[in-house]
């Protein structure tokens, strides 16, 4: 129970939320950051067609629309980036997400050729990637592209990390975890669904089974299968409820194992890894 409380406090999860209030918190958070650094003019986010990027994208667009109206500065823009690896199986969901979000700009960069070129260069150096590591390569290529776009548009890269993902470390280090700002960090999975419902998002985008879809050998592998625990159980844990001890052990095991992912590079002054 002590570790559970430490985790809840570290991730800032509330046991109950008001969806409209949380929407306003996230939008104002994004706006205040850009106001603090007026040389920044854009928010850049990869859109996958899943719950998290759909929610984050909508919040980004709301923030930029309000900033333009409040400041009179038409340079503020939200750039949604489609980053398929070849042909994406749920491409229609991606298009539905774009239709819902209505981004200022939509860019599409297919990462397949870049990933294959990197894999070939490594192969020539004697390194053959496993399917799992190739999946990480895809995630990092996507983030590289987003930073290039942000760099050319006075922008910041927005992340989709939320509490149910952070607690398990279910993201690629310096891939989808390598962002500038994370506006939904404090929310668990179910709370994110509530925000999308309040925003009028099509149900199929937040009722679908979450998948990172990074592995070629296991396409569409559901998050809950990879983690060995359901998001419902993770959400209940993060809300301070007592859950099945076996599920709690899995969640806490992921949390401890992936601590390094939630920190900046380790220095001689860090000691968390010794505990």
UniProtKB/Swiss-Prot annotation:
Domain of life: Bacteria
Pfam families membership: NAD_synthase
GO biological process, one term: NAD biosynthetic process
Entries under InterPro entries matching the protein: NAD/GMP_synthase, NAD_synthase, NH(3)-dep_NAD(+)_synth, Rossmann-like_a/b/a_fold
EC code(s) of this entry: 6.3.1.5
Enzyme class name: ligase
Assigned keywords, A-Z: ATP-binding, Ligase, Magnesium, Metal-binding, NAD, Nucleotide-binding
Entry binding sites for deamido-NAD(+): 140, 173, 180, 260-261
UniProt cross-references to Gene3D superfamilies, sorted A to Z: HUPs (3.40.50.620)
Binding site for Mg(2+): 52, 165
Pathway terms, separated by semicolons: Cofactor biosynthesis; NAD(+) biosynthesis; NAD(+) from deamido-NAD(+) (ammonia route): step 1/1
GO molecular function, one term: ATP binding
Residues binding ATP: 46-53, 160, 189, 211
Catalytic activity of the protein: deamido-NAD(+) + NH4(+) + ATP = AMP + diphosphate + NAD(+) + H(+)
GO CC terms in record: cytoplasm
Complexes and interactors: Homodimer.
Recorded family membership: Belongs to the NAD synthetase family.
Biological function: Catalyzes the ATP-dependent amidation of deamido-NAD to form NAD. Uses ammonia as a nitrogen source.
NCBIfam families in alphabetical order: nadE (TIGR00552), PRK00768.1 (NF001979)
HAMAP family per record: NadE_ammonia_dep
PANTHER family: NH 3 /GLUTAMINE-DEPENDENT NAD + SYNTHETASE (PTHR23090), NH(3)-DEPENDENT NAD(+) SYNTHETASE (PTHR23090:SF7)
Record-given protein name: NH(3)-dependent NAD(+) synthetase
Source organism per UniProt: Erwinia tasmaniensis (strain DSM 17950 / CFBP 7177 / CIP 109463 / NCPPB 4357 / Et1/99)
């Amino acid at each position: 129970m002590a570790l559970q409380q430490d985790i809840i406090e570290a991730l800032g999860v509330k046991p109950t939320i008001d969806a409209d209030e949380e929407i306003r918190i996230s939008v104002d958070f994004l706006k205040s950051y850009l106001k603090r650094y007026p040389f920044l003019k854009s928010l850049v986010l990869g859109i996958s067609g899943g719950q998290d990027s759909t929610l984050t994208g909508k919040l980004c667009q709301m923030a930029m629309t309000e900033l333009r109206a409040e400041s009179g500065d038409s340079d503020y823009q939200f750039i949604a980036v489609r980053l398929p690896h070849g042909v994406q199986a749920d491409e229609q969901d991606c298009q539905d997400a774009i239709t819902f979000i209505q981004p200022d700009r939509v860019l599409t960069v297919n990462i397949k050729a870049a990933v294959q070129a990197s894999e070939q260069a490594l192969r020539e150096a004697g390194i053959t990637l496993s399917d799992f590591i190739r999946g990480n390569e895809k995630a990092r290529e996507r983030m590289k592209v987003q930073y290039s776009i942000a760099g050319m548009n006075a922008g910041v890269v927005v992340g989709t990390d939320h509490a149910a993902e952070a607690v398990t470390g279910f993201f690629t280090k310096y891939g989808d975890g390598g962002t500038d700002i994370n506006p939904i960090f404090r929310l668990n999975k179910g709370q994110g669904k509530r925000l999308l419902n309040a925003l009028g998002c099509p149900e199929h985008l937040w009722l679908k089974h979450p998948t990172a879809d990074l592995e070629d050998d296991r396409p569409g592998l559901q998050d809950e299968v990879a983690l060995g625990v359901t998001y419902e159980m993770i959400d209940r844990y993060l809300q301070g409820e007592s859950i099945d001890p076996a599920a709690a052990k899995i969640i806490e095991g992921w949390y401890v194992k992936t601590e390094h992912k939630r920190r900046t590079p380790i220095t001689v002054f860090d000691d968390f890894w010794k505990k």
